[in-house]
């Protein structure tokens, strides 16, 4: 079971992958400014919230993706992060996926009792091209952690990560194309290369989305957001191979015609 926890919202664009940030796009659709960074009111303490029966709303065994509309190691969030670490410390039965582009800030902002890592935390860095992979992956490899991963999203070039995968420290690699208002293409050969590298190193690889523009055999395919994960899974490029029968995005509850956006708050603007 995978869910999202956004203890704060908003971010500052940091590198090439941020040029067409999905969070900025979705905030624009809601007449909001994605660069406005704030602590969320209702969900800040989500892992500790309980229902009327006294049970945690985030169930034991959940994979909780943290800060998907921000960056966990954002400078502006320094004043809130210790509270979040404390909540993570209290929920050892939940796995927290912590993803960042700011790899150089990780080591100095881990909790004092981090030691050689926490069993319920996966540290993940995003690397959109070879330059960022060569910058960020060595930093993450030098940080003590029980679980590490990296994500190539939006993937903007072929990425050779053989030397990093060969360390045996990475458990999982993910790749996604650029979506929402971005049109920089994702190429089949880039994904196939990552698949082959991960297969050789016996590291899990998940191709999670084609992006808006997917190029294969010299032909560019424009793929609607609702079909991008479906097409990625049907490609057979994940490793190990997995079930390709995945659900489509739900339809907007108002217009019933268009697919709802990720993180939809039913604003009605898809009409």
Regions found by a protein language model. Name each.
Residues 125-129, 133, 141-172, 177:
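Histidine/lysine/aspartate-rich catalytic loop segments that bind and position anionic ligands
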Residues 80-87, 136-139, 190-194:
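A general structural detector for well-ordered alpha-helical segments in enzyme core domains, enriched
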Residues 3-9, 162-271:
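Auxiliary Fe-S-binding modules of radical SAM enzymes
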Residues 69-71, 101-103, 126-130, 153-155, ...:
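Active-site beta-loop-alpha junctions enriched in small/polar residues
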Residues 64-66, 96-98, 121-125, 148-152, ...:
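Hydrophobic faces of well-ordered beta-strands that scaffold small-molecule active sites
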Residues 2-121, 130-133, 159-163, 167-170, ...:
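Conserved Radical SAM active-site core
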Residues 89-92, 144, 192, 199:
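Anion (oxyanion) recognition and catalysis
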């Amino acid at each position: 079971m995978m869910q999202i926890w956004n203890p704060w919202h908003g971010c500052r664009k940091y590198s090439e992958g941020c040029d067409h940030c999905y969070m900025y796009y979705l905030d624009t659709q809601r007449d909001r400014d994605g660069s406005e960074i704030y602590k969320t009111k209702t969900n800040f303490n989500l892992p500790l919230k309980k229902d009327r029966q006294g049970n945690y709303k985030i169930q034991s065994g959940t994979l909780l993706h943290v800060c998907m509309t921000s960056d966990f190691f954002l400078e502006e969030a320094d004043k809130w992060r210790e509270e979040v670490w404390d909540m993570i410390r209290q929920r050892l039965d939940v796995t927290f996926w912590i993803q960042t582009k700011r790899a150089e800030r990780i080591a100095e902002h881990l909790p004092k009792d981090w030691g050689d890592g926490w069993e319920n935390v996966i540290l993940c860095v995003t690397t959109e091209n070879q330059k960022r992979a060569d910058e960020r992956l060595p930093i993450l490899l030098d940080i003590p952690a029980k679980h590490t991963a990296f994500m190539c999203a939006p993937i903007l070039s072929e990425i050779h990560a053989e030397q990093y995968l060969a360390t045996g420290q990475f458990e999982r690699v993910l790749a996604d194309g650029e979506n929402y208002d971005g049109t920089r293409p994702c190429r089949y050969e880039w994904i196939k290369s990552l698949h082959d590298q991960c297969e050789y190193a016996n590291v899990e690889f998940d191709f999670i989305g084609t992006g808006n523009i997917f190029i294969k055999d010299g032909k560019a395919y424009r793929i609607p957001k609702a079909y991008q994960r479906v097409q990625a899974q049907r490609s057979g490029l994940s490793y190990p191979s997995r079930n390709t029968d995945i659900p489509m995005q739900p339809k907007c509850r108002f217009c019933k015609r268009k697919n709802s956006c990720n993180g939809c708050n039913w604003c009605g603007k898809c009409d």
